[in-house]
């Protein structure tokens, strides 16, 4: 059974309506285009999908905008956030005229680095274990205009809010300066949201380990296992995606949602 056949079977088994093609831009931000399943078959999965590369900052000029998204069929997952059942695939970006990897595609850069490592005899496998951390704020303001430039962040955990008036009262449960590592709730106000972020990551196939509050107020860490370069880079993109999506969901209703968790599943295709 080919990988494309396995993907088509997964689409059928999970009643998939859309296939989301995802790639990373030069700034490290994940981008996507969503294809209806009527456009998906073994042939299209093998040939790839055309898109406008000139609209991605730092890539092609308008007169050479055509580029190809080539799905990586060895790993896919059902997106747990989308209302419609959607299968997501990581993609490489190719030059359509030659079929070669595009030099400014981060995934292609990673593959070129691995090829150089092997060719130079430096090693045959490289493992990476990033320790990603982030802050959660209730309010963020940014302004750059003709007469001023400013930013301001706000968090209920911030010591600067110890005398602030809240409608429900100021309960005073917040870490002091450099006091966030690692008291239990209610001082740690992020227990549930971090747990949901980590669970969603696991749903999408990321090998997770732990989560905890970090030293600073509003600072958090999710732990995942190390892996090879491409695997870890893909996992880190899913890390960021999970953090942003879950935080956005909590920002809308201030409670756990586990959006469409019934649709969630993951598949790692065996490498050939």
Task: Enumerate the predicted regions with their spans.
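Glycine-rich, acidic/polar active-site loops that bind/position phosphate-bearing ligands
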Residues: 1-258, 272
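Hydrophobic alpha-helical segments, chiefly the membrane-spanning helices
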Residues: 260-263, 267-272
């Amino acid at each position: 059974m080919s990988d494309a056949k396995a993907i088509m079977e997964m689409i059928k088994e999970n009643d998939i309506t859309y296939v989301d093609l995802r790639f990373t831009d030069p700034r490290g931000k994940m981008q996507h285009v969503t294809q209806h399943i009527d456009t998906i078959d073994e042939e299209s999965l093998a040939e790839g999908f055309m898109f406008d590369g000139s609209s991605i900052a730092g890539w092609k000029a308008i007169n050479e905008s055509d580029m190809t998204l080539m799905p990586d069929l060895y790993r896919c997952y059902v997106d747990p956030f989308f209302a419609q059942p959607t299968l997501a695939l990581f993609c490489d970006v190719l030059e359509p005229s030659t079929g070669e990897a595009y030099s400014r595609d981060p995934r292609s850069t990673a593959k070129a680095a691995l090829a150089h490592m092997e060719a130079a005899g430096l090693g045959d496998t490289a493992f990476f274990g990033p320790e990603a951390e982030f802050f959660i704020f209730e309010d963020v303001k940014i302004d750059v205009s003709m007469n001023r430039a400013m930013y301001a962040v706000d968090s209920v955990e911030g010591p600067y809010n110890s005398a602030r008036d809240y409608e429900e009262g100021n309960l005073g449960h917040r870490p002091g300066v450099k006091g966030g590592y690692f008291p239990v709730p209610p001082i740690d106000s992020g227990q549930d949201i971090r747990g949901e972020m980590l669970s969603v990551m696991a749903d999408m196939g990321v090998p997770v380990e732990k989560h905890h509050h970090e030293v600073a107020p509003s600072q958090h860490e999710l732990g995942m296992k190390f892996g090879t370069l491409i695997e870890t880079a893909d996992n880190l993109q899913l890390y960021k995606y999970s953090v942003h999506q879950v935080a956005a969901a909590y920002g809308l209703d201030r409670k756990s949602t586990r959006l469409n968790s019934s649709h969630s599943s993951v598949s790692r295709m065996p490498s050939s």
